[in-house]
Curated annotation (Swiss-Prot):
The keyword Signal applies. Glycans are attached at residues 200, 403, 541, 689. GO terms for molecular function: iron ion binding; L-ascorbic acid binding; procollagen-lysine 5-dioxygenase activity. It catalyses: L-lysyl-[collagen] + 2-oxoglutarate + O2 = (5R)-5-hydroxy-L-lysyl-[collagen] + succinate + CO2. This is Procollagen-lysine,2-oxoglutarate 5-dioxygenase 1. One of its GO terms (biological process) is collagen fibril organization. The active site is at residue 721. It holds the Pfam family OGFOD2-like. InterPro entries: Collagen_mod_GT25, IPNS-like_FE2OG_OXY, Nucleotide-diphossugar_trans, Oxoglu/Fe-dep_dioxygenase_dom, Pro_4_hyd_alph, Procol_lys_dOase. Residues 639-730 form the Fe2OG dioxygenase domain. Forms hydroxylysine residues in -Xaa-Lys-Gly- sequences in collagens. These hydroxylysines serve as sites of attachment for carbohydrate units and are essential for the stability of the intermolecular collagen cross-links. Its EC number is 1.14.11.4. It comes from Gallus gallus (Chicken).
Length: 730
């Protein structure tokens, strides 16, 4: 028994702002028939575009088992002919009724019924099929096709329009099976001259009505004009009414569907971003959706301590969060263990797979996702790689409220175009740059974007993992990397992956050039990840000092301002002590040119720990700008021959004799706390009889070097005092 056709109630409801025309009697004689056995995301996109233009739609076969074959192969589709033949019985005698039969999963309307009917009647045929460049499924039939002087030669079965009686004639001879080829059936009718003339069939050779994308990707561009957007065929200079992402072109349809119909324009921005939201407003913490966060540390990663701090600071109740951690790197085991020990009880649950478990990337990602899939209480799975710097504490709530099956927040490398999504794929499935990629990354176009590839950070609905994505192994796929395999498998299930750049979320660390040979490797990241280096190591009040605030002058022409965080001070001291090769404090010093030091200290030079380039970058980026403000008219390139950390101890070297520095100006940064780590110490400028006896940790003194500022280091009486010194522009 053939199921009855299903008429969905939404199709007749008028929408505000629709572009479909006035609802004339002519348009009332238009009916759109489509086949959809399941309400996929592709179908819902088709439905929305039909709603927008106020088309009258009848859906055939809804909830019926699909037996029409694999849609990835050209053969099959006979089930659609059977359903159409059955539906046409009730319309056979309606001579004025025009019926459009169209696919739904990979189709968009770009214009309304008025334009469609006008172009159909201009064709002066009773039935018009879409046309394309390729013949299938039987290439031997090519010679039988009528020659075409201008346009596409071959019939495409994905869309056709005609009068009801003529369409009844078209399908009345169908007696095939559900998995027989509808394409071959219609092709043979068209190639029979008698039937073609009797039914009065023509092809839409110039894509005036139907734009099949297969074999025509280079022909189609977006046309923005007067707050509207259309697909334009450059080859024929036409504006098709219907866009069909047939064959391997579904990804291009996804791209076009980010704009058509009026989804996004330059004048309006995103018009659908607030549709179908899931509001979390007013929901008590204990009633919020449960999230499983999968954390993946797959390679040595800088700033991991900051990563865990940001994780803890996410604005979401920890008792509604479970955490799964896969740490592949022994280098990070101590940091992971510390986080688990200190914070595991704060969360609903926590599971860790470490280096000793020898679980590889793809398998670990499958395990994390499977924990959510198998837990009926898991509402969302949030995958988060350790190189993602997630600064927006509202990220989880934002993604949940957007209410998509799969959604990723945009993150990119600092001031780079490298990001966590691709706007297009090359023919072999790798990266290709879409026309809008740069605008999306730089947020010149803001909205929700259906994209073919996401990575690093994304959210998946738990119910989707238990339905469309219930396959337990999503992260393997031949020779593909785990992230590419995941996206490939998600796309194959017809699930859309969205990217949102409606908010600033954060960025991605560069893992290139990350060294693991030091005690505190993050210190060396000033080149690769300057923004994160600044956040960790530069004092929070440095910007105020740069504006002239928080700058003190305790002695004439001696400036005092914040520069380092406590972490920077501690790690620099610990790095020097870890290196351990302190100088002896003698005048003889092979480290300097000439081998003689007039005013020796017990110290370690920056170049001894391989930190000279990084220190120069620090001086150039942070000391030079403030120098030029404090000493107007002087412009420094922060050249230096000596940069070092000095250690003062009562039983070692407690003080330093009066001297001039071999510099134009000097910086002297206090690296620990007077009264806590040591007693005494400080600096006295003899010419001014002015002393600074309580240096503040992380603050620097800046003063002229040779000629005017003759000074001495005051005795350290207890503990150990550390300072970082640079003689600049010697």
């Amino acid at each position: 028994m053939v199921p009855p056709a299903v008429l969905l109630p939404w199709v007749v409801l008028p929408l505000l702002g629709v572009q479909g025309g006035s609802g004339s009697k002519q348009e009332e004689n238009l009916l759109v028939l489509t086949v959809a056995t399941k309400q996929t995301e592709g179908f819902r996109r088709f439905r929305r575009s039909a709603q927008f233009f106020n088309y009258k739609i009848q859906v055939l076969g809804l909830d019926e088992e699909w037996k029409g074959g694999d849609d990835k192969k050209p053969a099959g589709g006979g089930q659609k002919v059977r359903l159409l033949k059955s539906a046409l019985k009730q319309h056979a005698d309606k001579e004025d009724l025009v019926i459009l039969f169209i696919e739904s999963y990979d189709v968009l309307f770009a214009s309304g019924p008025t334009e469609l009917l006008k172009k159909f009647k201009q064709a002066k045929s009773k039935v018009v099929f879409s046309a394309e460049n390729y013949i299938y499924p039987d290439r031997k039939l090519e010679a039988k096709y009528p020659p075409v002087r201008d346009g596409k030669r071959f019939l495409g079965s994905g869309g056709f329009i005609g009068y009801a009686p003529n369409l009844k004639k078209l399908v009345e001879e169908w007696k095939g099976k559900d998995d027989d080829s509808d394409q071959l059936f219609y092709t043979k009718i068209f190639l029979d001259p008698e039937k073609r003339e009797n039914i009065n069939i023509s092809l839409d050779h110039r894509s005036r009505i139907f734009q099949n994308l297969n074999g025509a990707l280079d022909e189609v561009v977006l046309k923005f004009e007067n707050a509207r957007v259309r697909a334009r065929n450059l080859l024929y200079d036409t504006l098709p009414v219907i866009i069909h992402g047939n064959g391997p072109t579904k990804l291009q349809l996804n791209y076009l569907g980010n704009y058509i119909p009026q989804i996004w324009t330059f004048e309006t921005g995103c018009t659908v971003c607030d549709e179908g939201l899931r509001s979390l407003t007013g929901i008590k913490d204990e009633a919020l959706p449960m999230i499983l966060i999968g954390i993946f540390i797959e390679q040595p990663t800088p700033f991991l301590s900051q990563f865990f701090l940001r994780l803890r600071n996410l604005h979401y109740p920890k008792q509604r969060i479970q955490i799964f951690i896969h740490n592949h790197e022994e280098h990070h085991s101590m940091q992971v263990d510390s986080f688990v020990k200190e914070h595991s009880k704060e969360y609903l649950a926590m599971k860790v797979i470490g280096p000793d478990d020898e679980v590889e990337n793809a398998e670990a990602r499958n395990l994390g996702m499977d924990l959510c899939r198998k837990d009926p209480d898991c509402d969302y799975y949030f995958s988060l790689d350790a190189e993602v710097v997630l600064k927006n504490t509202e990220t989880l709530r934002i993604l949940i409220e957007q209410n998509k099956s799969v959604i990723a927040p945009l993150v990119s490398r600092h001031e780079k175009l490298w990001s966590n999504f691709w706007g297009a794929l090359s023919p072999d499935g790798y990266y290709a740059r879409s026309e809008d990629y740069v605008d999306i990354v730089q947020r010149r176009r803001v909205g929700l974007w259906n994209v073919p590839y996401i990575s690093s950070v994304y959210m998946v609905k738990g119910k989707v993992l238990r339905s469309e994505l219930d396959e337990g192994d999503l992260f393997h796929g031949g020779k593909l990397d785990a992230d590419m395999a995941f996206c490939h498998n998600v796309r194959n299930q017809g699930v859309f992956m969205y990217l949102t750049n409606r908010h600033q979320f954060g960025h991605i660390l560069s893992l290139e050039n990350y060294q693991t040979t030091h005690l505190h490797n993050d210190l060396w990241q000033i080149f690769s990840n300057p923004e994160d280096w600044r956040e960790k190591y530069i004092h929070e009040n440095y910007t105020a000092a740069l504006k002239g605030k928080l700058v003190e002058m305790p002695c004439p022409d001696v400036y005092w301002f914040p520069i380092f965080t406590d972490t920077a001070c501690d790690e620099l001291v610990e790095e020097m002590e870890h290196y351990g090769k302190w100088s002896t404090g003698d005048n003889t010093d092979s480290r300097i040119q000439g081998g003689y030091e007039n005013v020796p200290t017990i110290d370690i030079h920056m170049n001894q720990i391989g930190f000279e380039r990084e220190w120069y970058k620090f001086l150039l980026d942070y000391i030079a700008p403030i120098t030029e403000k404090l000493y107007p008219g002087y412009y420094t390139k922060t050249q230096f021959e000596l940069a070092f950390v000095v250690r003062y101890k009562p039983d070692e070297q407690p003080s330093l004799m009066p001297h001039h520095d071999a510099s134009t100006f000097t910086i002297n940064i206090a690296l620990n706390r007077v009264g806590i780590d040591y007693e005494g110490g400080g600096c006295r400028f003899l010419r001014y009889n002015c002393s600074i006896r309580a240096p503040r940790k992380g603050w620097t003194l800046m003063h002229p070097g040779r000629l005017t500022h003759y000074h001495e280091g005051l005795p350290t009486t207890k503990g150990t005092r550390y300072i970082a010194v640079s003689f600049i522009d010697p």
